Structures are given as C-alpha cells and as structure tokens.
Amino acid sequence: MKFFIPSHKRSNLLMKYTLGCLINYGIKKDDIFIFVDFSQEEEYKKICGEHANIIGFNDTGIGSARYYIQLFAQDKQIEYGFILDDDLQVLLYKSEKAPKGWWHNKYIKDAETAQKYLSKMEDDCLARSEILVGLTPRRVMHLDKPDVFSNGHPYGFYWLNFKKLKDLDIWYDHNMDHFEDYDITFQLLETGYNTKLYRDLGFSSFVIGTLEGGCYNNYQTKDLLSKARMLELRYQNIGVKLIEREIKNKSGQNNLSFKIKWIKKKSILQQEDFLGSITKKVVD
C-alpha cells in the first residue's frame, strides 16, 4: 500500500501530523511519497526525508499535485494507493459492534491494528482492481468497507475508479458533495458524463462545498469558474452553470457552497431544489 502526500510550505506540520501518524503505524519509507514544488524540495528532504521519499515537481496551482501523482503512479506502475492531506492525525475504523445503519468509529492507536485494517483495504482493492483515492480534510481517515460511500459522514474517505465505476447502486441516495479537491471533482463530472452514469442515475446537479477554507480562497473560486467554462466549451450538447450559495452554520457564520447544474442548451432543466434528494444538508 502506497501513500501519496501533496504538500505546500508545511514541512513541519506534515512531519507532526500525517507523516508522524504513518510512522507510528509502522509504515515504511518505501511506501510514503511526498510531492512538493521543486523550490521546496530541499527543505522537505531536511525535515521529512528520513521517513519519506520527497518528489519534486512543477507546482502550478490547484490540482497539479494530484495530476502529477497520477502520472507518477502510472510511470511506476503503482495500481493503488492513498492520497492524504498533510494534516492527518488519526485513522478510524467502523466498529463491528455498531448497529446496522450506524457509524460508530473507533480510533486506531497502535501499529498492529492499523496494519490489520490497511492490509484488509489492500486486499479489497486488489480484488476489485480499483484505484484507491483518499481525501481527509477533517484530519481523520476512515477505514470502512470499500463499497460504502462514507454514509452519514460528509468528510469521509472513499474509493473511486475513473476507468470503470462498479457497483452503481452505492451511488444512490448518497451525498455527492465533494470537499476541497476540485480537480478530482471535475474528473468525476467528466467521467460521469462520458459514461452517462450520473445522467442515467438522475443526477441533474453536483455540489462542491466546504465548511472550512477551500472556497474562501479567491483563486480557488476562480479556478472553479474557469474549469466550469472549460467543460461548457468541451461539450456541445450540455452546459455547466456554477451557482454560489451561502449556508448558515450553527455558530451563525456563512459558509460558501458551489452548485454545478447540468444545463441542456435548448431546454434548461427545471428543478427548484437543485440539490434534490441526492444530497444531504451541509451543516457543522
């Protein structure tokens, strides 16, 4: 099992959190790859190089790290692995005693338990011949069944296979929100349209949102808009409209959420509730 960690000017934080976590769980250096801009390569080698492989690349902004990780994995013939944020603190797993439909998570504190669950995930991945991608903005990584879309937890960890999406029933009635990782979100949009997956399942909208950070960053917002326009130009029969929405959280603060709605060129889809029944309300 390989671990890919894109990072930017946070070598000390990475060493304290994600890398420290992986070290505690007994993950070896050969399985950890940290991706940083060429200008930061020496700094990361000094702070983290003893425990991880530091890979320099030309960081051009949002999405470039994960795109480069994909190229790197293809070149090294690595078929699966985790992509982690650099502030990961702990692994979680679903309690076997949890009632059906409930998600009682337990913290993994020791290396033996971590290795047990990571090994199971690796076996599941091999059995499905899929690519494993993890996104962990809430500083935890869920180790749940790979056929479950982190139900009930919008900041979960999940499995994607861009070549062939299997077990389509898992996409029904699940939150299609995607947080922070806009590049993969748009890959999903393209993959979904190309395979008619989302259209066949009745998806007429897609949500990109965040409760912390993310969309508050202006250049990320502009990047979303430019990608939306790019998609609109790419497909002659379908357009993409990006709609900004504010959500009040429990503390009364505004959170930005972005909705992408597929729009037919001659007949705009009429749907008052753009999110419909396929999404859950995003709250703290």
Where are these regions (language model features)?
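Short loop->beta transition adjacent to catalytic acidic/histidine clusters or analogous donor-positioning motifs
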Residues: 1-2, 23-34, 52
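Short acidic, S/G/P-rich loop/turn micro-motifs used as interaction or catalytic elements
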Residues: 8-13, 41, 88-91, 109, ...
